[in-house]
């Protein structure tokens, strides 16, 4: 099983989620893919994702941006493998200025992001990681996040640092084989 966790204001309809799903379907493994709609509240997100992890023991995670932060929390809490795509590091700092009305990119759904949500994000921070669980993929051209924070945070993990690129990881398809190989490798 592979659980895809989308980023802030994104959705299961993201281009990367669709690519993973299509590849798994082409391999006859479509039933092994799940991409939940992550609630705006980090506490609710933790509940939803934690329950999903418990129902799918042995699953691997792919987390994009804020989804990478959640994937790190889940990977350490439930001893799961994870691929992190331009992951958010210290998102409670990055998103604090975003408090207020937000709109999801793919659905147009509006919600209010609050200071409580920022505090909930902080509560999910993982102090120590287990490097062997992770594959980090970052782009030096990420216009949203400083890739160096992730390189430092995930030191000791397998890393693919792509020169240039963008936050959405437009050339993600070029790395899908490495992503699936990491997810499918024995623990």
Model segments located where?
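Short active-site oxyanion
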Residues: 57-60, 133-135
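Short hydrophobic segments within beta-strands
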Residues: 4-8, 62, 137-139
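Active-site catalytic motif of lipid deacylating hydrolases and related acyltransferases
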Residues: 1-56
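The alpha/beta-hydrolase serine catalytic core
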Residues: 80-187
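Gly/Ala-rich beta-loop-alpha elbow adjacent to hydrolase catalytic centers
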Residues: 62-71
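Aromatic pocket-lining residues of Rossmann-like dinucleotide-binding sites
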Residues: 74-78
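Active-site phosphate/pyrophosphate- and oxyanion-stabilizing loops and adjacent acidic/basic residues
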Residues: 18, 22, 72, 148-151
């Amino acid at each position: 099983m592979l659980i895809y966790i989308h980023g802030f204001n994104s959705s299961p309809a993201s281009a990367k989620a669709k690519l993973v799903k299509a590849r798994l379907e082409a391999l006859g493994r479509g039933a092994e893919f799940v991409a939940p709609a992550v609630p705006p509240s980090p506490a609710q997100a933790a509940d939803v994702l934690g329950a999903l992890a418990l129902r799918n023991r042995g699953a691997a995670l792919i987390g994009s941006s804020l989804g990478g932060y959640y994937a790190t929390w889940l990977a350490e809490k439930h001893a799961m493998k994870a691929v992190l795509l331009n992951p958010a590091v210290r998102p409670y700092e990055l998103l604090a200025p975003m408090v207020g009305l937000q709109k999801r990119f793919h659905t147009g759904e509006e919600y209010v992001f609050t200071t409580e949500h920022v505090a909930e994000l902080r509560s999910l921070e993982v102090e120590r990681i287990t490097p062997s669980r992770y594959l980090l993929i970052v782009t030096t051209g990420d216009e949203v996040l400083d890739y160096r924070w992730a390189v430092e945070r995930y030191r000791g993990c397998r890393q693919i640092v792509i020169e240039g690129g963008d936050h959405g990881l437009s050339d993600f398809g070029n790395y899908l084989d490495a992503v699936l190989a990491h997810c499918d490798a024995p623990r």
